[in-house]
Regions:
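A short, hydrophobic/aromatic-rich structural module that often spans a beta strand
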Residues: 125-136, 152-155, 159, 226-237
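Surface-exposed strand-loop junctions at beta-sheet edges and helix termini
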Residues: 100, 144-145, 150
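Conserved, short, structured surface segments that act as functional micro-motifs
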Residues: 114-124, 148-223
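Residues that cap or initiate secondary-structure elements
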Residues: 86-88, 129, 140-143, 181
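Bacterial N-terminal signal peptides
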Residues: 4-14
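Surface-exposed, glycine-biased beta-strand/turn segments
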Residues: 18-119, 161, 198-342
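Zn2+-dependent peptidoglycan hydrolase active-site motif and core
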Residues: 92-94, 98-141, 168-170, 174
Length: 343
């Protein structure tokens, strides 16, 4: 009760300035020179070779396909790739990696081959009364350890090019700002993914990334901006209604996302998702559903699967959840076999 009261009061009080800073000395995001900030990708499309910097930004920025007269970028990039500001004579990046805000190191992966992230670490930040997680990937060296309390600008490691699909020429920092989907990820991984999960709850599949560059740009305009306000202002692409069955951990952890009374009875929840699959709103719903059901979607003449990383399918004003979409809902709602969750 007291925790709920404290959280409610914290949301009603005037917002305190949130301290955020970019994680390297490359600040060209703020200078209007994105080509000097983002690391480009190598692209060959319809016989044309290019190196677009846009491929290092957040969102659907990779893997173009032609659909009639349209060219659609179909691959989702969940963070941003930041160029090195300086290199040694051999071309190795020298940039130190800095914490974007005060927090605690909660995960370190020093074995590059255990993730597409290569060597990476995760920091938990208490921002606006809630846990927000930052991910720093492809590092050459990690100097922080789990449990370390860090300040804004604390050194976490050094930029590198470990992980999948990256070499020395394209060395960069991959940065994400995320919500934790489930506190029981091991159960979901056992039920739906298989293999070995080396990263506990801090596996990349359990971290839902927001538009991190957009967050930094908006925060620069308004230093009192809360991350929660930024997330809930993200446009919804589709909504899914799920049966309401007992207490929902994600909604309890992110009460700021709930519109209406979390404790008021209702037969279902309606969850708003961005096109990338980030939850951006939760509403108690009077609708009766037997299983997760798409109840709203942005009207598009392009098949929804191309615009939502395959989470939903269909055209125009109608859509259904794909297998990937159903697995996302299972992760978000802890809807997986209890025996798997126990392992």
């Amino acid at each position: 009760m007291f925790r709920h009261l404290a959280l409610t009061l914290s949301l009603l009080l005037p917002a305190a300035a949130v301290e955020l800073q970019l994680p390297t000395e490359n600040h060209h995001l703020f200078s209007g020179q994105p080509d000097k900030f983002y690391m480009y990708v190598d692209r060959i499309f319809e016989g044309e070779v290019s190196k677009p910097w846009e491929g290092g930004s957040f969102g659907f920025v990779r893997t173009p396909i032609r659909l009639g007269s349209d060219v659609v970028l179909t691959k989702f990039h969940e963070g941003i790739d930041i160029q090195p500001a300086k290199r040694d004579k051999a071309g190795n990046p020298l940039d130190l990696i800095l914490s974007v805000s005060d927090g605690t190191v909660v995960h370190v992966s020093n074995v590059a081959g255990r993730s597409n992230y290569g060597k990476y670490l995760v920091v938990e930040h208490q921002l606006g009364g809630d846990s927000i997680f930052s991910v720093y990937a492809h590092l050459a060296e990690i100097t922080a350890a789990p449990g370390d309390v860090v300040k804004t600008g604390s050194v976490l490691g050094r930029m590198g090019y470990t992980g999948a699909g990256i070499n020395r020429v394209r060395a960069h920092l991959h940065l994400e700002m995320c919500l934790l989907m489930s506190r029981h990820f091991g159960g979901w991984h056992s039920a739906f993914s298989g293999g070995t999960n080396f990263h506990g709850n801090f596996n990349g599949m359990n971290l839902a990334g927001m538009d991190v560059a957009g967050l930094f740009l908006e925060h620069r305009k308004n230093p009192e901006l809360r991350v929660q306000e930024f997330v809930t202002a993200t446009p919804a692409y589709f909504k899914v209604t799920i049966p309401r069955d007992g207490q929902w951990d994600f909604a309890s952890r992110h009460r700021w996302m709930v519109k209406g009374d979390l404790a008021a009875p209702s037969p279902s929840w309606e969850i708003s998702f961005s096109a990338t699959g980030l939850p951006v709103g939760i509403t108690p719903s009077p609708r009766e559903v037997a299983e997760p059901t798409v109840t709203a979607v942005r009207n598009s003449r392009i098949a929804h699967r191309h615009l939502t990383r395959g989470l939903i399918d269909g055209n125009g004003p109608s859509a259904t959840l794909t297998r990937s979409g159903k697995q996302l809902l299972a992760l978000l709602t802890d809807d997986f076999p209890k025996e798997a969750a126990a392992r």
